[in-house]
Amino acid sequence: MRYLTAGESHGPQLTTIIEGAPAQLELVADDINVDLARRQGGHGRGRRMQIEKDQVQIVGGIRHGKTTGAPIALVVENKDWKHWTKIMGAEPLTGDEEKEIKRKITRPRPGHADLNGAIKYGHRDMRNVLERSSARETTVRVAAGAVAKKILRTFGIEVGSHVLEIGGVKAEKTSYDQLSNLKELAEASPVRCLDKEAEQEMIAAIDQAKENGDSIGGVVEVIVEGVPIGLGSHVHYDRKLDAKIAAAVMSINAFKGVEFGIGFEAASKPGSEVHDEIAWDEERGYYRKSNNLGGFEGGMTNGMPIVVRGVMKPIPTLYKPLQSVDIATKEPFAASIERSDSCAVPAAAVVAEAVVAWEVANALLERFGADQVEEIEKNIREFNEKARLF
């Protein structure tokens, strides 16, 4: 599968087109809307979330609740567009209209795409950069991810996420009985944290950052359960599934690091404490006695849950802006201010779910065929039995 997105933060709509989804997949708008709503939640979101109440429109590829095998086209309208029709319109402006519009954005924000994008594409008004580089684009990435999650769920694979850290406050209690339990606990928390004590400290840290005109980042974790052995490949660098997932997580706005399993902790441990011992029983087949490697060996899934974490830096738009330089005058100024969040880590966990789900679903379809659901289900069932007895 593949998808493309189009649209700007304050344009009329955001669009994604998905190609390669199997036919006969049961899919309705509510399957997608539930994740769009989850993306908009979380303590620390800005005023924009009070304006936008995201709902998807399915405009192609689905008929009477089932995919047809044709490209799936999804649209999410921007409710705030009515206030931006002249500023963000596609048609040229008259001289009088140009005077009505607010000044060009010429003061880049440190940590954002503004200056680099303006230089790369020759934009004297950096709104052309920030509109597309905005995290608003993740709305339709979450929509695409919701389709991927429905594919995975159809074949018994579940995806969940939670927050491990915000603003230096770390969750200590992160244990859960099963993934459904983790998802329930995360959804009940305003910061998607399983540790109730840490949750309150995280909320306080977010409130303090907002009061200070500042922002804070954190760490999210995504878990995928029910994955067959052998998704991805060891034979070439660009077929390793953990590498694809790492790239996908790093593609999320403001993410600066990724790890699997115990991750960077492995650097300080001997191999005997890192590698997961192999066992077999008649019911499960092959399994690992631990999951330090986060479900991957040699770029391939090993049947254990995929466990991946991503680090999100603080959002670069600050209400107490850092110093910058005006590209029109070359004079020092405080950076431009756009409406923003003080913390988007809980929402970023939902985005991370989406991009991880996409890569896993893509690898699943690549391995087991992609034309129609019934064939894929048969292929997975036969392979799992073969792997159990191997």
Curated annotation (Swiss-Prot):
Family annotation (InterPro entries): Chorismate_synth (IPR000453), Chorismate_synth_AroC_sf (IPR035904), Chorismate_synthase_CS (IPR020541)
Record keywords, A-Z: Amino-acid biosynthesis, Aromatic amino acid biosynthesis, FAD, Flavoprotein, FMN, Lyase, NADP
Cofactor(s) it depends on: FMNH2
Residues binding FMN: 132-134, 253-254, 298, 313-317, 339
One Pfam family hit: Chorismate_synt
Reactions the enzyme catalyzes: 5-O-(1-carboxyvinyl)-3-phosphoshikimate = chorismate + phosphate
UniProt-annotated binding residues for NADP(+): 39, 45
Gene Ontology terms for molecular function: chorismate synthase activity; FMN binding
Note on cofactor: Reduced FMN (FMNH(2)).
UniProt key word Transmembrane: no
A biological-process GO annotation: aromatic amino acid family biosynthetic process
SUPFAM superfamilies, A to Z: Chorismate synthase, AroC (SSF103263)
The keyword Lyase appears for this protein: yes
Family in the record: Belongs to the chorismate synthase family.
HAMAP family: Chorismate_synth
Record text on subunit structure and interactions: Homotetramer.
Protein name: Chorismate synthase
Gene: aroC
